[in-house]
């Protein structure tokens, strides 16, 4: 059964452009080989980690949103686990309602302040 997933991948911040392109190519190849559909692959840049991971205090974040099934997730996570460049990853199954962006809230007008006596 095809479901929508999102995965956050944190890699070592000092990787070169060729290594980063290789990592993103590997992720897209895995999704394509399991007949998944890639919706979004974003580089969120280098950010400070909440705590040191494998002696790194910073990491480069990638966001991946795709459609796939359970064998695709299992293979993607297996390959990420074996890659030494990957510090952490997390995959989450999305609900159908979460696929659409939330509507924007209307601006709130503030009432004039009343002076205290």
Swiss-Prot record:
The keyword Ribosomal protein applies. GO terms for cellular component: cytosolic small ribosomal subunit. InterPro entries: Ribosomal_bS6, Ribosomal_bS6_sf, Ribosomal_S6_plastid/chlpt, Transl_elong_EF1B/ribsomal_bS6. The keyword Transport does not apply. Keywords: Ribonucleoprotein, Ribosomal protein, RNA-binding, rRNA-binding. GO terms for molecular function: small ribosomal subunit rRNA binding; structural constituent of ribosome. Residues 99-117 have a biased composition (Low complexity). Residues 96-117 are annotated as: Disordered. NCBIfam families: S6. Belongs to the bacterial ribosomal protein bS6 family. This is Small ribosomal subunit protein bS6. It comes from Geobacter sulfurreducens (strain ATCC 51573 / DSM 12127 / PCA).
